[in-house]
Amino acid sequence: MAEPYFIKAGLLPENPDEATRTWFAKVVALLAPSVNKLDELPERAGLIFKVDAAGALAAADNAEVLGGAKANEVLATFIEMAEADKSTMTPERFKAIMNDVKAKTETKGKDLFHPVRIVFTGSHSGPEFDKLIPILEEGSQLPLPVHVMNTQERIAAFKVARSAS
């Protein structure tokens, strides 16, 4: 039911293949609880389809999180650990990295997770990582009109934007 809105927005091809349809069902399931009407889904899907690392760093609503006492240490440690292993990010791998970041930085809760969420979505709030990460990884492999950046691409873009700011 949401497919026509994504096609009109240029986010899905006119005739998606089966893999794209299966992936798209996961996208809708992830985002539907956060909208009131189906036509709001493509805009909400911006966190999947549109990456603006510089904009995320400059966003006023992210300032408090990024200005937190441990935010720079958490981000630097996360980026270093995630880049060290070039394998595809999975929820399990992410959890292991975050446990290592937690131990190394002695940070937990929102001070640990919100800065990393900004790397992946451009916002300090959003979907659960265990649901989002597979969508990003799978989407990056599909023939979509707009490329979905996987987690490594998002980390790289954030690192570049962060060094430029």
Locations of the language-model features?
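Conserved nucleotide- and phosphate/pyrophosphate-binding catalytic cores
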Residues: M1-S165
